[in-house]
């Protein structure tokens, strides 16, 4: 699983209310949430981000209240992956559950500037700053998490597993 795109870089302690303000929590429609992603932080974010781009942030990204709306908004606006120095644990789980790839790597965050072209290999745990010709090592995604990402999130992964189990049960006669 390799992702490549332009970096959009922000700072520490970006909370879920900054990612998707509470005034938009009356919907769970990804397209609607995407329109308002990070708007209180960067009014032009949704106009600047292109499909496949990578969000880069400091420590404690996704802190604050637990809302799946935050990673849904990020994924729906076209971001392919988030690299941060650290993630709030509940955001980390929510991101995995909805199929948004996330990577913790302090060195990469320090070595990437806004606008840099970045490539992330989740399987190998390699982050490349193609603009500056630098490479950083992160912890590779475990295989079970890669499978969740490939399926598009935990719900789709479980549906696929249940279908396999049902198929196996039907064919074991």
Curated annotation (Swiss-Prot):
The keyword NAD does not apply. GO terms for biological process: L-leucine biosynthetic process. Its EC number is 4.2.1.33. SUPFAM superfamilies: LeuD/IlvD-like. It catalyses: (2R,3S)-3-isopropylmalate = (2S)-2-isopropylmalate. Heterodimer of LeuC and LeuD. This is 3-isopropylmalate dehydratase small subunit. The lineage of its organism: Bacteria, Bacillati, Bacillota, Bacillota incertae sedis, Caldicellulosiruptorales.
């Amino acid at each position: 699983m390799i992702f490549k795109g332009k970096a959009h870089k922000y700072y520490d302690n970006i909370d879920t209310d900054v990612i998707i303000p509470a005034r938009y929590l009356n919907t769970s429609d990804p397209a609607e949430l995407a329109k308002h992603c990070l708007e209180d932080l960067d009014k032009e974010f949704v106009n600047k981000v292109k499909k496949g781009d990578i969000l880069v942030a400091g420590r404690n990204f996704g802190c604050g209240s637990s809302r799946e709306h935050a990673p849904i908004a990020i994924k729906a606006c076209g971001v392919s992956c988030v690299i941060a120095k650290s993630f709030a644990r509940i955001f980390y789980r929510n991101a995995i559950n909805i199929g948004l790839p996330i990577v913790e790597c302090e060195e990469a965050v320090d070595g990437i500037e806004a606008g840099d072209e970045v490539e992330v290999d989740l399987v190998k745990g390699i982050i490349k700053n193609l603009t500056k010709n630098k490479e950083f090592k992160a912890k590779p995604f475990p295989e079970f998490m890669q499978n969740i990402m490939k399926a598009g999130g935990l719900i789709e992964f479980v549906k696929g597993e249940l279908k396999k189990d049902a198929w196996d049960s039907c064919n074991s006669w």
